[in-house]
Curated annotation (Swiss-Prot):
Name of the coding gene: NOSIP
Identification of the protein by name: Nitric oxide synthase-interacting protein
Family designation: Belongs to the NOSIP family.
UniProt subcellular location: Cytoplasm; Nucleus
Species of provenance: Bos taurus (Bovine)
Region spans: Disordered: 126-156
Assembly, per entry: Interacts with NOS1 and NOS3. Interacts with PP2A holoenzyme, containing PPP2CA, PPP2CB, PPP2R1A and PPP2R2A subunits.
Amino acid sequence: MTRHGKNCTAGAVYTYHEKKKDTAASGYGTQNIRLSRDAVKDFDCCCLSLQPCHDPVVTPDGYLYEREAILEYILHQKKEIARQMKAYEKQRGARREEQKELQRAAAQDHVRGFLEKEAAIVSRPLNPFTPKAASAGNGPDDAQPGSSAGPAGKDKDKALPSFWIPSLTPEAKATKLEKPSRIVTCPMSGKPLRMSDLTPVRFTPLDSSVDRVGLITRSERYVCAVTRDSLSNATPCAVLRPSGAVVTLECVEKLIRKDMVDPVTGEKLTDRDIIVLQRGGTGFAGSGVKLQAEKSRPVMQA
């Protein structure tokens, strides 16, 4: 007996494992992967730097950012929009000049043709026995040079580009730029974002005697500002806009929504002032966070 049946290539069926392995190695098809806990950021980490925030701010949609990182992002986006707008205006001006040049050349050709016809001594009389198409305005004098009544294939061959003839060499046209949007968008939600929309966030540390460096090494760093419950990715929490305090959603539903008063500053609250913080998830499917990452790549179709 040989060991042919023990080899991984001896099977007559293309297995799912072999298909996934070949797809990953080929560079084609959409790749899917299930994210684990190690690939999920903590609730108090910046969405850009993925590091614990020193001066956190939150957007109206609940995405947490480091103030320095998000302001640098907004500044970079404004510079990029200005650069794209400058390139768009430059191309637009070049197209206008090109159109004017073509109109000017067409007008000069029209004048030149009129002067040549007027200066000619001998002109052929119009033939009244011409086809309808010619009597509609296309006389023998208006016929294009080199055109014939031959088959359509010959005319098509004449219109084909020729790389060895300078006059028939195809021209590579520049890509037409679309007018860029002047609105800076949030890198996570894609919605419009302004500096005035950012709300400062004040986390309540678990132990006020421990400095920031010591808090980073702990798994439980912050607590609810009202109930003193521990905050983590497994605890849904919200930010109160007037004070910036972080509280649990359970505290919001059971205590704060009854009077709609900020427990820290005493100011009146509205539904817009309660910002639900976007958590990173726990790695479990029941955490309510999408834990499936996809990467779209070219697809080969038969």
